[in-house]
C-alpha cells in the first residue's frame, strides 16, 4: 500500500530544523539483517540525509504471548513538523451501541505500519545506521511518526468501506455499521450482512496486498474490541480483563508522576462509560488533574514531576480504581452481571467525552 494518494497533502514536508542531527542509537547487525529481509529497511543512496530516526524495541503482551515490536522514532521531525495529526478516535461510549446488533466481525492488520510503503522521495527523511556503520533508510511507514496513526486510519477506513472516506459505490451498505480504530475494524449488524461485508473487506485488503491478522472474529456474539468485552447475546458490555489489570498495575495516585496521573485519569474516564459511572461525583479529582496538565505545556513542570494531588482528589481517584477492581471481580464470580450501554439521552457518554477533551486541552 502506498501512502501518497490516501492523504490529501504531502505526508512528509521538509524539516525546518536545518541540518539533520544523527542519533547515537544504531540497529544491531542481526536485527538489521531481519529488517532487510522483511523489506522494512534498505541501503541509503548517496543523497543528502533529510532526517534521522531513533530505532528501539518494546515488548508487547499479545494473546499468543510476548512479542517484540520494532519502532522508528523520528524525534526531530516530530518536533519540527508543523502538521498536527487529525483523526476521529472518539470516546469509547461511541463504540458501545453496536452491542445491540445480532453479531459482529472484528479484523485487524498484521504489522500494520510496516505494510505501508514509503514513497522513495520521502525515505531520506528516515535514516539511521547499523552497528557496522552502514547507512540505511526506511522503506516502510515509520511507527513513531506523529502523523502515522492518521495515515493508517485513512487507509484502514478505505479498505473497510467507511462512507466518509470512499465513494458510495465502494462504501459499506447501510445495514452494517463500520467502526475503525487505526488498524482495527469492527463490522456490526445481522450475522448474514456482517459475514457478507467481511468477505468484501477481505477482498479489498487482498487487492491492496494488505495482510489481515490470523486471530479474527467472524460473525461473533462474544468478543473483545478496544479493551471492552461485548456480549451481543445479552446486549451488554463489560471491561476486559486486560484493561482492569492495566489499571491495577498503575502506581498509587499519592506517589504518581504527572504522566502517570494523566494515564490513570484517561483510563478512569474510559471505564466510567462502561460502568455507567456518574462523573459528576468525581469532579474534584478530574478538575485537579486538568489543572496540572497546562503546566507541562507552559514548561513549569516536567512529565516526570510529582503530581502532588490533594488528598481529597487522591481519595476519589483511588475510590474509582477500587470500583473498577471490585466490579470486575464480582462479574467473574457472577457471569450474569453485565452493564448495558447507556442510551443517547443519558449523561454518562456525554460527560465522559466532554471531560476527556478538557483533560487533553493544554
Roles of regions detected by a PLM:
Residues 19-153, 204, 238, 242-289:
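Catalytic-core region of right-hand nucleic acid polymerases
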Residues 47-53, 62-64, 119-120, 308, ...:
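A short catalytic or substrate-binding loop motif that flags glycine-/basic-rich loops and adjacent residues
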Residues 219-331:
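C-terminal reverse transcriptase regions that engage the nucleic-acid substrate
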Residues 149-202, 214:
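Active-site palm subdomain of RNA-directed nucleic acid polymerases
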Residues 68-70, 105, 180-181, 338-342:
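Residue-level marker for buried hydrophobic side chains located in beta-strands
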Residues 102, 111-114, 187-188, 214-236:
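Short, conserved secondary-structure transition motifs
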Residues 329-362:
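RNase H-like nuclease fold core
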Residues 1-20:
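Non-catalytic, polymerase-adjacent accessory regions of viral genome-replication enzymes
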Amino acid at each position: 500500500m502506498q501512502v501518497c494518494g490516501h492523504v490529501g497533502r504531502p505526508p512528509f514536508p521538509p524539516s525546518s530544523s536545518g541540518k539533520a542531527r544523527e542519533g547515537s542509537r544504531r540497529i544491531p547487525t542481526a536485527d538489521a539483517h531481519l529488517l532487510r529481509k522483511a523489506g522494512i529497511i534498505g541501503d541509503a543512496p548517496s543523497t543528502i540525509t533529510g532526517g534521522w530516526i531513533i530505532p528501539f524495541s518494546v515488548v508487547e503482551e499479545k494473546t499468543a504471548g510476548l512479542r517484540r515490536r520494532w519502532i522508528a522514532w523520528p524525534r526531530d521531525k516530530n518536533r519540527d513538523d508543523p502538521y498536527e495529526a487529525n483523526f476521529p478516535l472518539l470516546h469509547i461510549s461511541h463504540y458501545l451501541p453496536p452491542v445491540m446488533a445480532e453479531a459482529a466481525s472484528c479484523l485487524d492488520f498484521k504489522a500494520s505500519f510496516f505494510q505501508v510503503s514509503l514513497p522513495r522521495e520521502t525515505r531520506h527523511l528516515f535514516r539511521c545506521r547499523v552497528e557496522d556503520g552502514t547507512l540505511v533508510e526506511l522503506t516502510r511507514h515509520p511507527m513513531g511518526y506523529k502523523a502515522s496513526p492518521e495515515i493508517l486510519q485513512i487507509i484502514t477506513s478505505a479498505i473497510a468501506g467507511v462512507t466518509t472516506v470512499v465513494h458510495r459505490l465502494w462504501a459499506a451498505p447501510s445495514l452494517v455499521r463500520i467502526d475503525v480504530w487505526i488498524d482495527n475494524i469492527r463490522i456490526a449488524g445481522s450475522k448474514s450482512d456482517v459475514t457478507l461485508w467481511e468477505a468484501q473487506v477481505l477482498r479489498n485488503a487482498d487487492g491492496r496486498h494488505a495482510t489481515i491478522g490470523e486471530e479474527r472474529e467472524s460473525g461473533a456474539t462474544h468478543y473483545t474490541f478496544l479493551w471492552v468485552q461485548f456480549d451481543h447475546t445479552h446486549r451488554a458490555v463489560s471491561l476486559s480483563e486486560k484493561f482492569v489489570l492495566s489499571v491495577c498495575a498503575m502506581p498509587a495516585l499519592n506517589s504518581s508522576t504527572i504522566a502517570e496521573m494523566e494515564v490513570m485519569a484517561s483510563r478512569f474516564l474510559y471505564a466510567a462509560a462502561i460502568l455507567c459511572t456518574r462523573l459528576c461525583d468525581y469532579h474534584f479529582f478530574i478538575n485537579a488533574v486538568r489543572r496540572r496538565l497546562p503546566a507541562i505545556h507552559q514548561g513549569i513542570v516536567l512529565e516526570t514531576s510529582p503530581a502532588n494531588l490533594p488528598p481529597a482528589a487522591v481519595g476519589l481517584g483511588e475510590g474509582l480504581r477500587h470500583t473498577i477492581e471490585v466490579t470486575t471481580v464480582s462479574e467473574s464470580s457472577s457471569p450474569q452481571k453485565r452493564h448495558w450501554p447507556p442510551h443517547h439521552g443519558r449523561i454518562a457518554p456525554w460527560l465522559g467525552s466532554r471531560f476527556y477533551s478538557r483533560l487533553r486541552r493544554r
